[in-house]
């Protein structure tokens, strides 16, 4: 879809599709709900709707854990709109089951559990899939031919259909646990399709129908003058059709993570191979997205500049490093006076025998079996090939001993990144090897590390420019980037050069290096940006104002309010939203919870109940929030709509 070039700054609303509720939707928001949301949005002056990813994640509630970079999630299907015959009683029975579950006694609203109004994802998906299978049995021959024609123009769907069938036949286990077909090549996939096409074609037909529904919804939004903004995660689940069938696109030796120790578990890309293919897989992915979206958000855009790569044998990310990066070579270390023995001392974890016995007691011998002895000394060190954290976890050591061993294995000044190449570890200045160096040796190594960082930053700029330029080649969609966190110096310039919008979140848009860390004035937000009040991984605006930002004098100052002003409740929400509306950002898009909070009656009593996700946690409440107000109710909430019209007019009049 082509992004409409508005002549004014735009107001948008951000809402997970799953969170929308209408009389026709069945337990979760559906593609067919988007036009009704769009009509309400247009009536109050909202011109953009942003949703989270809608790819198939199976029974995983996180929309960022996709089984396919291309396939749509069946959970968003509007069953009543399928031309295929369905037993009306089946749909009514599922609706009744979901209603009864919501009324079940004992379901109390808590931060960590599913509240009565939240999505019961497993039940919804299982029920819909059961009904969809019965519909498939009634599909007309003419429609199957149409689906076959559609499949020829969507070659990804064949491998996805095979993957889905095999996953079902293997009790939904990851492909790495299958007894057969774990490592198919193209010939294997072709033979497998011929053998299993009749069974697998259900998923082809289903994707064809889902694309029909999503395309129709997107086109209706277009006719309303409301742009649809999608979300394209940079990373793909290991247990996905893409990795299973197109292994060469990925570097399975590493998982993506972050320098603070988070291991996200997603394989990183093999950019060299993708480049040799002219980024075919990525171009296909973007073309698929362009069928539905006028604009799209690049999740974790920093990963296109550099990614924190974690060896696959670790479950933490402390032994990770940025790829690409300029390596420290053995020759450079030798030139500084470090011989082979001292390079080994710096690049492997070492364990004095007395330390092992003191820490591990009777289990010290088990630890020593995983290590290698240094000559005949009472000194041990990690092997060239390990142990990594997963090997330690699988050892017969007690839980306490394993927990004590993990940080010791990370005690390396240098990490090996290849034959005769290294990089400094994340916390190298606190390692045993570093603390043993002389002052001059530390200065020399720091100088070398800084020079390598300077070269790496040039590599990151080159990588980001090349990859993001590829993603901008079509030019019809508006491209926005999630550029939060510690960013390399080159990122803002590359985004500006390519016309990609960055992200400005009020609570994190501060001058962190200055005393009192003042907020960046709203008037200083760049034009090429999306301004927002909160994101799906944060508290809501109302929750932030009542918690972290309570009595924040710097916030009051940037809002131009008196020091005794009360920012709690709807008054604080209104003050922040109005300030953001006056920012020069091309787009200001707010979570629907923050817009509803303009009117106290439209929100839950506890703002924590409206959180989408709490990062780093696995709990039933994550990704299951659902609006308590239906789409049918929105147009008659006159106080809310009047407040939104007034808010949106601030942008239109700029």
Residue ranges and their predicted role:
Residues 1-654:
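Catalytic cores of glycan-processing enzymes that make or break glycosidic bonds
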């Amino acid at each position: 879809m082509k992004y409409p070039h508005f002549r004014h700054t735009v107001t948008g609303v951000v809402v997970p599709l799953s969170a929308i509720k209408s009389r026709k939707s069945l337990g979760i928001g559906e593609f067919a709900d988007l036009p009704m949301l769009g009509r309400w949005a247009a009536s109050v002056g909202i011109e953009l709707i942003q949703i989270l990813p809608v790819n198939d994640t199976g029974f995983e509630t996180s929309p960022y854990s996709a089984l396919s970079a291309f396939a749509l999630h069946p959970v968003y299907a509007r069953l009543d709109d399928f031309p295929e015959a369905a037993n009306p009683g089946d749909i009514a029975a599922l609706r009744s089951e979901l209603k009864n579950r919501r009324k079940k006694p004992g379901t109390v609203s808590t931060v960590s559990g599913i509240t009565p109004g939240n999505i019961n994802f497993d039940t919804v998906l299982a029920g819909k899939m059961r009904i969809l299978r019965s519909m498939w049995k009634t599909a007309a021959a003419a429609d199957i031919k149409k689906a076959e024609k559609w499949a020829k123009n969507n070659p990804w769907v064949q491998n996805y259909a095979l993957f889905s069938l095999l996953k079902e036949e293997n009790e939904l286990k990851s492909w790495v646990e299958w007894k057969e077909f774990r490592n198919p090549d193209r010939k294997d996939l072709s033979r497998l399709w011929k053998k299993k096409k009749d069974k697998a074609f259900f998923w082809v037909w289903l994707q064809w129908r889902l694309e029909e529904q999503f395309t129709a919804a997107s086109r209706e939004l277009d006719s309303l003058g409301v742009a649809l903004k999608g979300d394209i995660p940079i990373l793909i689940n290991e247990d996905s059709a893409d990795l299973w069938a197109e292994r060469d696109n990925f570097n399975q030796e590493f998982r993506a993570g972050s320098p603070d120790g988070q291991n996200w578990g997603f394989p990183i890309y093999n950019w060299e191979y993708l480049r040799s293919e002219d980024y075919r897989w990525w171009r296909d992915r973007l073309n698929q997205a362009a069928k539905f979206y006028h604009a799209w958000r690049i999740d974790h855009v920093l990963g296109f500049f550099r990614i924190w790569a974690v060896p696959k044998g670790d479950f933490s990310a402390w032994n990770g490093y940025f790829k690409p990066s300029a390596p420290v070579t053995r020759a450079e270390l030798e030139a500084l006076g470090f011989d082979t023995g001292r390079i080994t001392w710096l690049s492997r974890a070492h364990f004095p025998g007395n330390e092992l016995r003191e820490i591990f007691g009777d289990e010290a011998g088990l630890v020593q079996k995983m290590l290698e002895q240094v000559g005949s000394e009472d000194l041990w060190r990690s092997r060239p090939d390990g142990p990594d954290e997963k090997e330690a976890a699988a050892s017969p050591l007690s839980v306490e001993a394993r927990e004590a061993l993990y940080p010791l294995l990370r005690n390396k000044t240098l990490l090996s990144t290849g034959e005769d190449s290294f990089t400094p570890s994340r916390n190298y200045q606190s390692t045993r090897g570093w603390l043993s160096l002389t002052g001059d040796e530390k200065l020399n190594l720091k100088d070398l590390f800084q020079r390598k960082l300077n070269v790496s930053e040039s590599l990151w700029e080159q990588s980001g420019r090349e990859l993001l330029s590829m993603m901008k080649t079509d030019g019809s969609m508006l491209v926005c980037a999630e550029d939060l966190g510690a960013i390399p110096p080159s990122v803002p310039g590359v985004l500006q050069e390519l016309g990609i919008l960055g992200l400005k979140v009020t609570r994190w848009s501060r001058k962190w290096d200055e005393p009192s860390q003042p907020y960046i004035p709203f008037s200083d937000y760049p034009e090429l940006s999306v301004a927002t009040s909160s994101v799906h991984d944060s508290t809501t605006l109302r929750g932030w104002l009542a918690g972290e930002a309570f009595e924040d004098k710097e916030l009051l100052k940037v809002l131009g309010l008196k020091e005794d002003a009360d920012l709690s409740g709807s008054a604080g929400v209104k003050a922040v939203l109005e300030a953001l509306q006056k920012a020069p950002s091309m787009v200001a898009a707010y979570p629907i919870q923050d817009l509803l909070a303009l009117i106290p009656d439209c929100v839950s009593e506890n703002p924590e109940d409206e959180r989408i996700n709490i990062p780093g946690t696995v709990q039933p409440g994550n990704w299951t929030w659902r609006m308590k107000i239906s789409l049918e109710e929105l147009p008659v909430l006159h106080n809310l709509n009047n407040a939104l019209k007034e808010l949106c007019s601030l942008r239109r009049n700029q």
